[in-house]
Amino acid sequence: MNQQLVAEYFDHKDGRLYWKKVAHPNKQYLVGQEAGSIHATGYRHVTWQGKVHKVHRLIFLLEHGYMPKEIDHINGDRQDNRLENLREVTRSQNQYNKPMCKNNTSGSRGVSWHKASKAWVVRVSVNQKSRLIGYFKDLELADLVGTMAREKYHGQYAHS
């Protein structure tokens, strides 16, 4: 798949992908309509040429002429496919700002209760490895230290 082929079938504007051309004569009504639908993962997908594609990846290809291995939604909103919200990242960088786990009990990213120590433990992922930051009796302090560690190690990719 290349930019020229995608541009033959799709236009994009304001983070939305629109059908420019369709292959099947019975689908001509789609021309000019927004392409795809929202998947259970929260990403907008479109079926084209017998394959399912994430819309943000097609928009990135249309604009930049290549498709990187990883593309990040800067603001974390998987449906916000505006160009200014998309950036090429490494796998590690993309993991740094993923949403907080649903089973998180502390309410703080990277902070969990350590029974044996009777303290909150702060861990941060660095280059796909968990790094122990420290143990804290106070949850607010653990949260603050965790935020500072993410800013230090993740930089612009840190997620609060």
How does the language model describe each region?
Residues V22-A23, Q49-Q128:
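Short, cationic Gly/His-enriched loop motifs
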Residues T47, S112, Y135-K137:
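Generic structural detector for well-ordered beta-strands
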Residues V89-Q95, K152-S160:
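Extended, polar beta-sheet/loop recognition surfaces of beta-rich domains
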Residues K137-Y153:
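A short, charged, amphipathic alpha-helix used as a generic interaction element across diverse proteins
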Residues R16, I133, Y157-S160:
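Intrinsically disordered, low-complexity regulatory segments
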Residues M1-R44, W48:
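Short helix-coil boundary/hinge micro-motifs
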